[in-house]
Curated annotation (Swiss-Prot):
This is Cytidylate kinase. Belongs to the cytidylate kinase family. Type 1 subfamily. Pfam families: Cytidylate_kin. Keywords: ATP-binding, Cytoplasm, Kinase, Nucleotide-binding, Transferase.
Length: 217
């Protein structure tokens, strides 16, 4: 039995999975399903960025005032829960994520959580490269922008939120550009990550593919 397979199946062992990918690539659904399969705590790192964005909007903080944003990033409570799926919040989160000091402050919360949680799957954009470079297993999920926009459109419609497909597509393209081109922790797969394009795959088929890789002898 491989060491990876042993850690995955023995729930008494520490096991850390880093799952990265762009917006609406399907990593959330896939991550949740994988976490259930291997008895892992499932954490979306984006929650701290979206929560900071929510706080900036709520407190009417101009996100170009970097010092105020940095100061606010020190006070994030990772246990707070809000409905943060709004695309405007996601856009603000992507903008403040380029600030090095903000990423440092928020990543400290995430690293602490990983270090104090024996079995965890953390999903985000730089988990395998920055937050948890020593994770036991790294996955990078992607899909073409049109497919991702359609997925997000359906998600928002299901929640009864008004949305326009083309606007969502343009927001995703803009966020991709910002995430990939930022100087601090740009969006890219770790060198040792398993890369999967989900454009034509169901979440279940992706999970099965990942499980086959983890559980192979």
């Amino acid at each position: 039995m491989t060491n990876l397979k042993s850690k995955a199946l023995d729930f008494t062992q520490n096991f850390v999975i880093a799952l990265d990918g762009p917006a609406a690539s399907g990593k959330g659904t896939i991550g949740f399903m994988l976490a259930e399969k291997f008895s892992l705590k499932y954490v979306q790192s984006s929650i701290v960025y979206r929560q900071l964005a929510f706080n900036c909007i709520k407190e009417k903080i101009d996100i170009t005032d970097i010092n105020k944003v940095i100061s606010l990033s020190k006070e994030i409570n990772i246990t707070d829960k809000f409905d943060l799926e709004d695309e405007n919040i996601g856009g603000v989160a992507s903008q403040i994520a380029v600030i090095a000091e903000v990423r440092d402050n928020l990543n400290k919360h995430l690293v602490k959580l990983i270090n104090t949680t024996p079995r965890i799957l953390m999903e985000g954009r730089d988990i395998g490269t920055i937050v948890a470079p020593n994770a036991d297993f790294k996955i990078f999920i992607t899909a073409n922008p049109e497919v991702r926009a359609e997925r997000r459109y359906k998600q928002l419609q299901a929640k009864g939120k008004a949305c326009i497909l083309d606007e969502i597509l343009q927001q995703i393209i803009l966020r991709d550009k910002r995430d990939k081109e930022r100087e601090v922790a740009p969006l890219l797969p770790a060198l040792d990550a398993l890369i999967i394009d989900t454009s034509k795959l169901s979440p279940l088929s992706v999970v099965e593919q990942i499980m086959q890789f983890i559980l192979k002898e």
